[in-house]
UniProtKB/Swiss-Prot annotation:
The chain crosses the membrane at residues 5-25. The gene is petG. It is found in: Plastid, Chloroplast thylakoid membrane. This is Cytochrome b6-f complex subunit 5. Component of the cytochrome b6-f complex, which mediates electron transfer between photosystem II (PSII) and photosystem I (PSI), cyclic electron flow around PSI, and state transitions. PetG is required for either the stability or assembly of the cytochrome b6-f complex. It comes from the Eukaryota. Belongs to the PetG family. The keyword Transmembrane applies. One of its GO terms (cellular component) is cytochrome b6f complex.
Length: 38
C-alpha cells in the first residue's frame, strides 16, 4: 500500500514539476526571442 502511495505521489509530481519549469522558462525564452538573444 505504501508503494502504491509513493508511486502515485511520484507520478503526480513529475508532470507538475515539468509544467512548473516550462511555465517559468517560457517567458524568459519569449523575452530573449523578442530581444533576439539566442
Amino acid at each position: 500500500m505504501v508503494e502504491a502511495l509513493l508511486s502515485g505521489i511520484v507520478l503526480g509530481s513529475i508532470p507538475i514539476t515539468l509544467a512548473g519549469s516550462f511555465v517559468t522558462a517560457y517567458p524568459q525564452y519569449r523575452r530573449g526571442d523578442q530581444l533576439d538573444l539566442r
